[in-house]
Amino acid sequence: MWAIGGVQLNSRLLLGTAQYPSPQLMSDAVKAAGVEIITVSLRRQLSPQKENYFWDLLRSLPCHLLPNTAGCSSVKEAVNTARAARELFNTHWIKLEIIGDEYTLQPNPFELVNAATILVKEGFEVFPYCTEDLILCQRLVDAGCRVLMPWAAPIGSGRGLMNTYALQVLRERFPKNILIIDAGLGRPSHAAQVMEMGFDAVLLNSAVALAMDPVVMAAGFAKAVEGGRLGYEGGMIKARNVAKATTPLIGKPFLIEKP
């Protein structure tokens, strides 16, 4: 059991709702993984031309909605989108995304901090999508963010942890903040590695939605997240450069050479 934004949760896996072959597969994947928080894009997925089936399906799931500002590239766009999301979904949670480069989808750190400062003052619980840069994360915490969502690698790349050292530093420097890896994971083993490092949760989208079988993959990631967390809580042994026997010598016969 853990808590985020005043909400008690069991699952440490969050799922995005985009790119699935069908809304029903998305729903099945969410249920298979036992997910309790799902993200949704107001700008990319909400359209007056679309049928209400998708939104009805989202609301039917036993999950908390975390709207995001995907597609925004400025403070003004992100803040306006966040305000609209609060009205539409009746939540003060917002996953803050402000992209600074369309090729790498790397967040714009300057706009991100400015937008976070505004939204925190307006009462939002801000979940900022950021890089693993220590100074950026410190500025976000100083702005009032209690949650940080650093990437492991660029969105949708599936590359896994590109900078393990920097991520470990974040965990050590922000022990009281909730840290959720937000992008770049491609395999369940990546998720297990993140959780073994002490991160609080993992957010996935492409790795599940674009898998050959999203439902099976969602279940696999859920088990990996759980296993990694248990490994962290259990206290893993430290790696050694030499072998250490595990079998005691008590009761084991041995020869004594006569002088």
Curated annotation (Swiss-Prot):
GO molecular function: thiazole synthase activity
UniProt keyword list: Cytoplasm, Schiff base, Thiamine biosynthesis, Transferase
Catalytic reaction annotation: [ThiS sulfur-carrier protein]-C-terminal-Gly-aminoethanethioate + 2-iminoacetate + 1-deoxy-D-xylulose 5-phosphate = [ThiS sulfur-carrier protein]-C-terminal Gly-Gly + 2-[(2R,5Z)-2-carboxy-4-methylthiazol-5(2H)-ylidene]ethyl phosphate + 2 H2O + H(+)
EC number(s) on file: 2.8.1.10
Binding annotation for 1-deoxy-D-xylulose 5-phosphate: 156, 183-184, 205-206
GO CC list: 2-iminoacetate synthase complex; cytoplasm
Record has Transferase as a keyword: yes
Pathway: Cofactor biosynthesis; thiamine diphosphate biosynthesis
Enzyme class: transferase
Origin superkingdom: Bacteria
Family designation: Belongs to the ThiG family.
Assembly behavior: Homotetramer. Forms heterodimers with either ThiH or ThiS.
HAMAP family: ThiG
Name assigned to this protein: Thiazole synthase
Organism listed in the record: Coxiella burnetii (strain RSA 493 / Nine Mile phase I)
